[in-house]
Amino acid sequence: MFRHSKVYITRNIKETDFFKTTLEKVGFAVFGESLIEFSAVDFNLNLDVDWLFFYSKNGVRFFFNQLNNNQLEIIKNKKIGTIGSGTAQFLAENYNRKSNFIGTGEPMQTSRAFAQIAAGQKVIFPRAKQSKKSIQQQLSSVLTVIDLIVYENRPKSQIEIPETDILVFTSPMNARIYFKKYDLKSSQKVIAIGHTTGNELLKIGVQNVVAKHPSERGLAEAVLEIKIES
């Protein structure tokens, strides 16, 4: 149906990922590569808290991978919140931990919902050094925010991205890096995973469509919709 159509997503993808398999079934060539490289940041951990709240899969990975056995035992009794279903699924599949709260993926909606169940409690927010802190900034007046940097991200020194019909951006930083090197072609369409990334693209001067849901399924559906309409 969409033979010869090409899509690029700013995320490292596996052959079995839903985004890739769904679009390839209908003829798309799918390219995926993050424009960011990640590294762990050492941290001191105070576990006198009620909740852990994760913004991303990387936040989960760099937090849990640096814990010792004693710390892993202690956090079994802590409640866990995640910004969205993708992070919750990653947490369950890789660390056998169930999320007690799963957000919608959108910071404003997620903040309001989380505030209703965590008000007055202590919450650790493991994050990237360059994070926009989109959830915790909105919650500092209703709960005790414990900020914890567990990794840092920096632009890859060398990137070579093929020209495609559709560009899918999964973070503001990926968007900034891409458009520092490449210009938007008049024929290209742009999709953002959420409003934070969409607003960053607008600041750069790039019009975009925001996916209805910040998941692999939501992104794949956005690609199909934008291609059908074009």
Residue spans of the language-model regions?
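Conserved beta-alpha
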Residues: M1-S230
